[in-house]
């Protein structure tokens, strides 16, 4: 507690760095997960293998995954960013897929009747 009170500038800088890294990794993860979930929804054969690989990645301890990326990206925020994006994928892709699968077919039919296209 003494360190926090004695160094508020350092704590604030590190807090903002942490929030920025987390927010940026979540943004990247969403940009990857939405099209991937849509692809898996349209190509059901791929859903099982892709979700299995993402599940296996999710079981790797976080520190081990970050250490695995250090030789590839170096000892910097990029290693952490890649690990965070990979960890988010199983959660996001599975939920995007569940959301798309949960759309009532009657709603899709009504939307097509009103002119909805593929996108």
Tell me what each language-model feature is.
Residues 49, 74-82:
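Membrane-water interface of transmembrane alpha-helices in multipass transporters/channels
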Residues 16, 42, 72-74:
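Helix-loop interface residues and adjacent transmembrane-helix termini in multi-pass membrane transporters
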Residues 27, 31, 53, 82-86:
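Hydrophobic residues within alpha-helical transmembrane segments
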Residues 1-25:
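Periplasmic/extracellular loop-to-transmembrane helix junction in inner-membrane transport proteins
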Residues 36-69, 84, 94-98, 102, ...:
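Cytoplasmic-entry segments and transmembrane alpha-helices of multi-pass inner-membrane transporters
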